[in-house]
Amino acid sequence: FLQGCNVAELEDKAFPVLLNIRDQDDFQNVWLNHEYAGNKEVDYNHLKVVLIERSFLEKEAEVEDMLSMLEQEKEVPWNAYVMTTESCDRLAQTEGKLDTLLGNYLEELLENTSGIDQKAYPTLGMLYEERANHLETLYIPFVDIEGEQSGAVEDDTEKPQITAYEVWKRGRAAGLVDTDTARAAFFTQNFADD
């Protein structure tokens, strides 16, 4: 016989769809206090995207510690997409202009990209595996607000877009490449149509 959660249990939980990681201190503080968001228990089973600021992603030892901790805890789904940006806060400013939560929007952005198989986009599980085997080159989508170079978001039409890709090689960040270069790499890996 099957049992489910009663209404009170669901009301007492928070289900984040986006995890922002800005730096090691921020990550440790969030993770050490992750069990509760206000008065709600946090359940990461619905997490769609882990968004890591590029300045943190470039710190090999700190990223290694973060991945090790996430893998050991097993609370964040392995199939959560990994993306990077210059500023998580700047992207968060766009959420009010979106028809959905930022995490859902970013997931849809990946899954609806024409001509690219969604298996091309790195997940936490792929980063865990690459940490161990150092065989693949992954391309982590770099998200920015298209048409904006810096400052606050002012134009209602500006939404987050994939503007480049961070190359992840031998378990560490190796620099940005443009979308055409990444698409060519996806094509050679059979993840893109010609």
Regions found by a protein language model. Give the residues of each.
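Membrane-proximal alpha-helical signals and transmembrane carboxylates
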Residues: 1-194
